[in-house]
Every structure is written in structure tokens, then in C-alpha cells.
Design a protein with these regions (language model features):
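Structural signature for extended repeat/solenoid scaffolds and their inter-repeat hinge/linker regions
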Residues: 1-169
């Protein structure tokens, strides 16, 4: 009998399903089992292109949520910054990788992140999530390099130090 409870079973099942169906299955599995955590959502959704995210959403099948991954996430995740990040990814509003880089926009993002991360107070996570989740990988690399130049700190480490609960996500 085939089971998906073992790591091998999960890998075999994912390979059999194919790239987007397996991601939809993982996105569907996270809330059904206690042993699965937010990592499944992160691995299956975050950082994907809009096209890939749309394909994963199209492959999501769960009658309880009328085949809507957005409804599933809204109902199953607690109302916190992680849900905001996942919902932003599901909105398919991420910059495309082939979009030309805008130096002024990158400088503006670095300044906004600097305002959030370099002040002593907490807060600003929602704005930070909005920036990071919706930018392309190329944009994020340029932003991280400029952040290092301006603030002489690693952007990822600054985010972890500022918002430990977001860094886990």
C-alpha cells in the first residue's frame, strides 16, 4: 500500500503529480496534518513567479474551500504577518523578473526598509512584507546590495534581528 506519511512517500507522490500539482498538494497538506508547518507553504509558494503561482492555484483542489487556495489560507492561517505574506504571494502581484530595474525605486525601497529596520522601535513588518514579497529576485538582490552599501549591514540579518517571528516564516 502506498503512503505519503514517510519522506520517501511524499517525494514519490510529488514526482508522480508533476511540478504544479505537487506544489498545490503541499499547499493543501499544510493545514490538514499536525506534523506539517508553515514551511510547506513557504516552499511551495513563496518567491514563485506570478505564472507559477497562478498554476499552483489552478491545481489546488479542495471541495471544502471550493478549490480556492486563497479561501483556504484566509480560513486556516491565523490573522498575522505570515498570512499577509502568503496572501500577497497568492495575489500574483510580484514583479516579473524581466522587468527593467528602476534605480530610483530600489533606492526608495532601501530607504523605506532602512526607516523600519534601523530605528530602535519594533513595527513596520506589514510594509516590509509588502516590499519583499512583491519584488522580483533581481530587484531584491540589487536592494540587498544597496542596503549593505548604505547601512553597512546585511539586509537579511537586519530583518531577522528586527522581526524574529517573520524570519522564521
Amino acid at each position: 500500500m502506498f503512503t505519503t506519511s514517510s519522506p520517501f512517500g511524499k517525494v514519490a507522490f510529488a514526482v508522480a503529480l508533476g511540478p504544479y500539482e505537487s506544489e498545490a498538494w503541499f499547499a493543501n497538506s499544510w493545514y490538514q496534518k499536525k506534523e506539517t508547518r508553515n514551511e510547506l507553504l513557504i516552499e511551495s509558494l513563496m518567491g514563485r513567479s506570478n505564472k507559477e503561482t497562478a498554476q499552483i492555484k489552478a491545481c489546488f483542489k479542495d471541495a471544502k474551500y471550493n478549490a480556492s487556495l486563497e479561501k483556504c489560507v484566509a480560513d486556516e492561517l491565523p490573522a498575522n504577518k505570515f498570512r499577509i505574506a502568503v496572501m500577497a504571494q497568492l495575489s500574483c502581484s510580484r514583479m516579473e523578473e524581466d522587468r527593467p530595474l528602476d534605480e530610483a525605486g530600489i533606492r526608495e525601497d532601501v530607504a523605506r526598509l532602512g526607516t523600519i529596520l534601523e530605528r530602535g522601535a519594533t513595527g513596520g513588518e506589514t510594509e516590509m512584507v509588502g516590499i519583499i514579497v512583491t519584488r522580483s529576485d533581481r530587484w531584491l538582490r540589487e536592494m540587498a546590495a544597496l542596503y549593505r552599501q548604505v547601512y553597512e549591514r546585511d539586509l537579511a540579518k537586519a530583518i531577522i534581528k528586527h522581526s524574529k517571528n517573520l524570519a522564521v516564516c
